[in-house]
């Protein structure tokens, strides 16, 4: 594991262990930025800052930087009353990809906060297969049913279970290609 990733993973653990997670605004851009700063402050000079450059990954171009601020306002206003609405908001935020780096790890924590606040559930990420998840995310801008079906299968009401939280954080980093054994 690269040192930046290791430090960021430690920061993610600390976000929960310190109780700082409870001070984060749920479902807002400000909350998303707060999580990003917590994970990446001192690691990236752009921690918590909305990107001003266009980015792409695997041939997919994320929202154009020129319109990003307007898009983020619209996403923040999206409803969060049901599982479907919450996942739709998550998909739109993924398409926006507001940061230069660290979007996935940040947004999965953000998603769980929204699910916890509105549905009293979180995703038990340790059981969500990496390739199925990444495939569903890749297809989600066109059709998010695959993602909704996959994540709904692993919802749990055990929202304060430390093992579920920390295994989920590790799985989130694994999705991005980081493994503890890489040290």
Task: Name each model feature, range by range.
Residues 1-183:
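FIC/Doc superfamily catalytic core
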